[in-house]
């Protein structure tokens, strides 16, 4: 056991952790030259296209150290994006140490900080690494100071390397073996294994990634899932080298995969503990804190025949992604679908794209909303995650919206722009600290504003230099109203949105103008209105298409013309009574972009 090292890499997006992991795999000979591909561990097509890591992956490598010993390195890759921070905490729970990779040109960013604190809270050994020293803009001295100043760990002897060229990577491995402690645990005790991640394989059923804390697990053992109490047979187990390799036994301290032919998706929840049926452990390992979704949106299949396969797809995806929440929902405009909860907008996009790609579905998304806390007039507290569930205005005592605490790190010269943006988003400043040329800002901003487009706007006002980390702080009373959209005097539930009263007027106007461009012209006038309760705040009309009925009259008598025009008018009136309007998918997406271009 003393030759096992379990570690993961923490870094901000684009600081080079996937490239560094490629190099480590290469040095340890995990893959032959032919099989080496850039970003070996980003196995999802989506991950490769966007160049981000979404899912945690694991690899077991043998490293021949300079002291003549052979060490087994278990390396768990983690994502860097703010929406996937819960993935990071799961990966870290299985490790004893972490490499903190910082770009020597860019310096410390908010996300690095957040993940680094998570690692420190779990008492992991954090080893700082300065990457990209081959770049002309690299300034390792300054960045080392920043690490000490902002993160507060000793970085005087931080390793300098360039994952791209391979310089300094062997030093990283030596330092790993030296500084990161070996796993602790009792090899002869009862088995306790932590489920770090699970995913669904069409042939094998549920595959779980596990870390053995105590005891050992052999092929053919009967294992028990501690939360459900159900027993399964350990059919196959092994390690990733990144390829799946079968083994007969997983020893104490190792990280590997396990297949128990579990067909039920909820059979092995992430964060659960496995133990042996014949010699069970007394208590389960501390799991992970449940993540609360911050953003909710309705997802509906375009054709209602897809509903069943959509439900199965969501089930399989939620196994792989513990933070995805969903419940059935029906809408008069869109039929049957699901209300889904996500961690942020990127998470929502990724899930929608994965559903469309991996499961071949066509989906419509409604506008994302956050969860509001409503105190009704008879003093009940209700949580509302969709505008259609909001009680009538006269039943609401007070409406509270979620406030997010946003930590931003940015260069001084962009401070003015960022503060202006935060004020526009109804934020209040709680803290501001200068670290050299960087400024650490803390603002409390309503979650609805953060979720909408705050991240994009922050990046654009600061030319991409500012970085953001946010978490839910509390609910706060606020003057929020529901803006309904009426098309030909009928409410369309899927288009409603909840917004602050001050913004309601112009968001309503913006929305009806956008809808006017997107709804195709019909044979009759279509009135699009935005309303708060019964009070109409904005209206626009999609003009009808009409045939020139007078074309065949030539000279003709005026009464003849009047008769023809009146006949056309009556016909249009009749059409309007029975006609209904087809809304294109773009119309639903219009809400997502309300207020984005106009500012």
Swiss-Prot record:
It catalyses: GTP + H2O = GDP + phosphate + H(+). GO terms for cellular component: plasma membrane. Its main location: membrane. GTP binds at residues 14-19, 131-134. It is found in: Cell inner membrane. Gene3D superfamilies: 3.30.70.240, Elongation factor 4, C-terminal domain, Elongation Factor G (Translational Gtpase), domain 3, P-loop containing nucleotide triphosphate hydrolases, Translation factors. PROSITE patterns: G_TR_1, G_TR_2. The keyword Cell inner membrane applies. Residues 2-184 form the tr-type G domain. Keywords: Cell inner membrane, Cell membrane, GTP-binding, Hydrolase, Membrane, Nucleotide-binding, Protein biosynthesis. It holds the Pfam family LepA_C. It is a peripheral membrane protein. One of its GO terms (molecular function) is GTPase activity. Its EC number is 3.6.5.n1. It comes from the Bacteria. GO terms for biological process: positive regulation of translation. InterPro entries: EF-4, EFG_III/V, EFG_V-like, EFTu-like_2, G_TR_CS, LepA_C_sf, LepA_CTD, LepA_IV. Required for accurate and efficient protein synthesis under certain stress conditions. May act as a fidelity factor of the translation reaction, by catalyzing a one-codon backward translocation of tRNAs on improperly translocated ribosomes. Back-translocation proceeds from a post-translocation (POST) complex to a pre-translocation (PRE) complex, thus giving elongation factor G a second chance to translocate the tRNAs correctly. Binds to ribosomes in a GTP-dependent manner. Belongs to the TRAFAC class translation factor GTPase superfamily. Classic translation factor GTPase family. LepA subfamily. This is Elongation factor 4. The gene is lepA.
């Amino acid at each position: 056991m003393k030759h096992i090292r379990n570690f993961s890499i923490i870094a901000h997006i684009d600081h080079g952790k996937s490239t560094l992991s490629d190099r480590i795999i290469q040095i340890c000979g995990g893959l032959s030259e032919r099989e080496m591909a850039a970003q070996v561990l980003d196995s999802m097509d989506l991950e490769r296209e966007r160049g981000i890591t979404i899912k945690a992956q694991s690899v077991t490598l043998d490293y021949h150290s300079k002291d003549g010993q052979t060490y087994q390195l278990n390396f768990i890759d983690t994502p860097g994006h703010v929406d996937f921070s819960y993935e990071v905490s799961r990966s870290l729970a299985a490790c004893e140490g972490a490499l903190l990779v910082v770009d020597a040109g860019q310096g410390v960013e908010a996300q690095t900080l957040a993940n680094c604190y998570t690692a420190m809270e779990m008492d992991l050994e954090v080893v700082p690494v300065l990457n990209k020293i081959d770049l002309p803009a690299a300034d390792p001295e300054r960045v080392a100071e920043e690490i000490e100043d902002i993160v507060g760990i000793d970085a005087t002897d931080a390793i300098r390397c360039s994952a791209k060229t391979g310089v300094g990577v062997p030093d990283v491995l030596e330092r790993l073996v030296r500084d990161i402690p070996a796993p602790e645990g009792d090899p002869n005790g009862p088995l306790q294994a932590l489920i770090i991640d699970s995913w669904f394989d069409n042939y094998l059923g549920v595959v779980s990634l596990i870390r053995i804390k105590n005891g050992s697990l052999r092929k053919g053992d009967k294992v028990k899932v501690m939360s459900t109490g159900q027993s399964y047979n350990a059919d196959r187990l092994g390690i990733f080298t990144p390829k799946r390799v079968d083994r007969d036994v997983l020893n104490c301290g190792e990280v590997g995969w396990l297949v128990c032919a579990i067909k039920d998706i909820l059979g092995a929840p992430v964060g659960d503990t496995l133990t042996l049926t014949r010699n069970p452990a007394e208590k389960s390992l501390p799991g992970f804190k449940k993540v609360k979704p911050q953003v909710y949106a309705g997802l509906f299949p375009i054709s209602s025949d897809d509903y069943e396969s959509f439900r199965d797809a969501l089930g399989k995806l939620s196994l792989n992604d513990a933070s995805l929440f969903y419940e059935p929902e029906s809408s008069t405009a869109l039929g049957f679908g699901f209300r889904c909860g996500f961690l942020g907008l990127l998470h929502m996009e990724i899930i929608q794209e994965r559903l469309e790609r991996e499961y071949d579905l066509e989906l419509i998304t409604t506008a994302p909303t956050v969860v509001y806390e409503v105190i009704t007039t008879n003093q009940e507290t209700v949580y509302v995650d969709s505008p259609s569930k909001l009680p009538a205005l006269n039943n609401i005592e007070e409406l509270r919206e979620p406030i997010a605490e946003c930590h931003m790190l940015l260069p001084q010269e962009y401070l003015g722009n960022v503060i202006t943006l935060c004020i526009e988003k109804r934020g209040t400043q709680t803290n501001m600290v200068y670290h050299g040329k960087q400024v650490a800002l803390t603002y409390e901003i309503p979650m609805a504003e953060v979720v909408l487009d705050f991240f994009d706007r922050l990046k654009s006002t600061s030319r991409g230099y500012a970085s953001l980390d946010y978490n839910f702080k509390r609910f706060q009373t606020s003057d929020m109203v529901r803006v309904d959209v009426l098309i030909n005097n009928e409410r369309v539930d899927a288009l409603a949105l909840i917004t602050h009263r001050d913004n309601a007027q112009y968001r309503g106007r913006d929305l009806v103008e956008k809808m006017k461009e997107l709804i195709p012209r019909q044979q009759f006038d279509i009135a699009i209105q935005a309303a708060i309760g019964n009070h109409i705040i904005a209206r626009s009309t999609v003009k009808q298409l009409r045939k020139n009925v007078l074309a065949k009259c030539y000279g003709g008598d005026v009464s003849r013309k009047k008769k023809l025009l009146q006949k056309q008018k009556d016909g249009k009136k009749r059409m309007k009574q029975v006609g209904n309007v087809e809304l294109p998918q773009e119309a639903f997406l219009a809400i997502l972009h309300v207020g984005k271009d106009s500012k």
